Amino acid sequence: MLREKYGHPDIAISVDGQPGSDWLISYFSDQVRNGVSFKAGQTVQVGWALLKLADGDAGELTVSEPDFASMPVHWVGGSSRVMRHLILQREVCDQIGEEPCFPSMIQPGVVSPSFVGGRSAFTMSRDDEGWLFKADDDDGEGARLCSLYAVGIERTAVIPFLALPPGAVVEWKSGSAEIEFKGQRYSSQSNSFLDRLLASPALI
C-alpha cells in the first residue's frame, strides 16, 4: 500500500492480534504520508522502547523489537511486546490523570548496588534528570548508571511505571505498589488496575 501510494517500501508488521496494532500501522502510514522516509537499520521509538527496521525478502521493510531478555539487545521479529508496554504505560499514567512522559530505553537511570538482579522491595523516583532506582535494603552508597533497558530486563516490575512524569515516586514490594504524585497517593490496595497489574505479571 505504501509503495503504490507513495513510492515508499511497504512496512510489514507482525502483531499477533495485539491491541494497539491498528495504531502502529496508522503511525507508519501517517509518517510516510507526511514525507518521512524509513530505511533499513533505522530505529523508531514507540513508547519507551525501540523498533528496528530491516530489509525484507520482497523489498519491504520488516519490523523487529527487543526480546526484553538479552543484553546487549537481541532483535526479534514483531512488535507485540513494545505495544503491550505502550498500552500499560499509558494506562498507569491515566490512573493519576497525567499524560505519559516516555523516556527512551537507551537513557540511563541511577541504580543502587543490589537493585539490578535483586528481588527485594524498591522505590523508583523520577526528576528532571531521569529515574532513580533504589532497593529498600541499600543504603544509597555505590550507585551507578544503567540503561533503562538493562534495568527493565532484570526488574520487569518497573516497566509499567517508566512513563510516569517527573515528580512521581513508586514504592513497590511483593503484593503491593503505590504511586505518589503531586501530594496524592494511588495504591494497588484501592486501585483495581494496579491490583490487576500486580496479580498478572505476564501482562508485562
Per-range role (PLM):
Residues 1-54:
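N-terminal leader/presequence regions that precede the main folded/catalytic core
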Residues 11-15, 145-150:
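A short, exposed loop/beta-hairpin motif centered on an aromatic-Gly-Thr core
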Residues 22-30, 34, 99-115, 152-154:
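Short, basic/low-complexity N-terminal boundary segments at the transition from targeting/disordered tails
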Residues 43-74, 150-188:
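Short, compact, well-ordered microdomains
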Residues 47-123:
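Surface-exposed beta-loop interaction hotspot
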Residues 120, 143-144, 153-157:
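Extended amphipathic alpha-helical regions
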Residues 125-138:
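A short, structured beta-strand/loop element
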Residues 182-204:
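Polybasic, proline/glycine-rich intrinsically disordered low-complexity segments
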